[in-house]
From Swiss-Prot:
Gene designation per UniProt: Gne
UniProt name for this protein: Bifunctional UDP-N-acetylglucosamine 2-epimerase/N-acetylmannosamine kinase
Active site: 517
Source lineage: Eukaryota, Metazoa, Chordata, Craniata, Vertebrata
Annotated binding of an N-acyl-D-mannosamine, by residue: 476-477, 489, 516-517, 566, 569, 588
Chain positions recorded as UDP binding sites: 19, 23, 113, 220, 253, 282, 301-302, 307, 321
Annotated spans, N-acetylmannosamine kinase: 406-722
EC number: 3.2.1.183, 2.7.1.60
Summary of activators and inhibitors of this protein: The UDP-N-acetylglucosamine 2-epimerase activity, in contrast to the N-acetylmannosamine kinase activity, exhibits allosteric regulation by cytidine monophosphate-N-acetylneuraminic acid (CMP-Neu5Ac), the end product of neuraminic acid biosynthesis. Moreover, the activity is contingent upon the oligomeric state of the enzyme. The monomeric form is inactive, while the dimeric form selectively catalyzes the phosphorylation of N-acetylmannosamine. The hexameric form, on the other hand, demonstrates full proficiency in both enzyme activities.
Amino acid sequence: MEKNGNNRKLRVCVATCNRADYSKLAPIMFGIKTEPAFFELDVVVLGSHLIDDYGNTYRMIEQDDFDINTRLHTIVRGEDEAAMVESVGLALVKLPDVLNRLKPDIMIVHGDRFDALALATSAALMNIRILHIEGGEVSGTIDDSIRHAITKLAHYHVCCTRSAEQHLISMCEDHDRILLAGCPSYDKLLSAKNKDYMSIIRMWLGDDVKCKDYIVALQHPVTTDIKHSIKMFELTLDALISFNKRTLVLFPNIDAGSKEMVRVMRKKGIEHHPNFRAVKHVPFDQFIQLVAHAGCMIGNSSCGVREVGAFGTPVINLGTRQIGRETGENVLHVRDADTQDKILQALHLQFGKQYPCSKIYGDGNAVPRILKFLKSIDLQEPLQKKFCFPPVKENISQDIDHILETLSALAVDLGGTNLRVAIVSMKGEIVKKYTQFNPKTYEERISLILQMCVEAAAEAVKLNCRILGVGISTGGRVNPQEGVVLHSTKLIQEWNSVDLRTPLSDTLHLPVWVDNDGNCAAMAERKFGQGKGQENFVTLITGTGIGGGIIHQHELIHGSSFCAAELGHLVVSLDGPDCSCGSHGCIEAYASGMALQREAKKLHDEDLLLVEGMSVPKDEAVGALHLIQAAKLGNVKAQSILRTAGTALGLGVVNILHTMNPSLVILSGVLASHYIHIVKDVIRQQALSSVQDVDVVVSDLVDPALLGAASMVLDYTTRRIH
């Protein structure tokens, strides 16, 4: 059994309420069933599964060869708001006995139905861990309130899209308990191949129907605006009658307003109309084939904006029920849908088209990820949830440990030459610092980092410093969410696709944050330096290379692929010198320490570097500092090179001002003081007048990389953790 602290099988209770959530839960249930060494599965069926009017869909669960442990009749008929509330109450009355009998370790709940809210409430109050499937999504209806309420009750979260993951993080959920897996139903969608799909089409729509020459309609009531929902459904049916294509109409969900929608169908004779087939339920594997080969789908079901995109089938999304969801280009929104002509026009626009397949909601590998996630759950961990609230300015909870100890962070700086580890206090004081040469191989480097951090952590105890976590600054591109170095600079070898968080966290039993050196410098300025209290500013680091970080509205910008603030690679000349990145004309190719060293060597080789009062020992490499010294002593060529370098940096700053319009630019690093006056001159000459009042200053921080690494940890301690 995988390492998770458990010495027995995990008892998993899957509770399903209707046909839609079963389509998402079934792939997970099949996956659990295939691993009996790890899991025991109990299935609880309730809600509309057990209602004859909605097809008694519990039978399809039995046909899938699942043993239904418990059937709970929880639906109070009436299909109005009061009936929904009474149904939740009835479920809350019945569920405690079931859960006491089953004693599950974890309950899996899907989506945003009122039945699911009852399940999550019961499990939470009975101290049963909850895994919520498809949290974090936004539709634009009352479903959002229910979904987000379940999120607050749930201990673990499986989401389908990156934006849903970000919503969960914004809701202060613990990132370590969020899995971006994709939609489980996509595992079946993307592997569904049925050469005999025509027999399915004929079975549901008639023998004379051709592929791509029919419509699937699926519309549900919006419970916060039932009257408008009924009117829109009536207009939709009128438009479909007028469009005169064979149409499969599925009955709506058993929500408030559904009874009135069924009355509209019967009033218009839909169940007996030659062009319509009205059905209560279609098995999911057959439904997949029907929507995959339809001329279009119309309605307001989430299926239209989620699953159908996998086939590129045209979709007409009516009203506001799915207004907040991500959609592919196959979806045409008719948000008002207040006239028959408008809906009819949408049908003419969409019917029969074929769009590119969309995989916004999954890649077909959700279930393996979910099973791995389940196996990682440690039942010995405290049940109480932790919420990660945003920083609270200067508002740290006090206890006796806080008073007697110095709250501190371990900061790690991985440079091209040196590896440094420091104990940094809450006030930004470097209490103790360790420096070693950075090894050339991955194994030696990881080993040395661990050794130095363990040594520093032990020393922190002697110094009465309470270490709250580890922050790491490294060159290259970093995924800070995962703590992984994606691509490193050429100065640090064997440092691509490196997981830094896991080995340090496992060894030190502390939380670990990782970011690149440019971002760390910006965070150091935000917490300890001249950026403190500034809403928008940019930091430029002038060292061996050129880096930077951008703070916008007090937050660090990482970019969609963690490549924001590569300021050294802003191009300032079309025919400039080659850059280490493979391009040419970059700021770094002019103004970095490497660039100045290159120019210094050229002058030295031509005997044009040294002037009176200068000497370079034979065993000493010529570098940027020699060029600066020569310029100070009157070397005109050295002065010209520095002027060109400073101008290139200044042009880069002008581009930043025109793009970001920050109120402050901080120049950091050993070359900053040599460039600042030139940069200010370029701004006066080249920048728009509206941005020329920007403050450009030299950083007064001695170790921005270490302080920035520490700030990731120390900022975290100002959050409330419950």
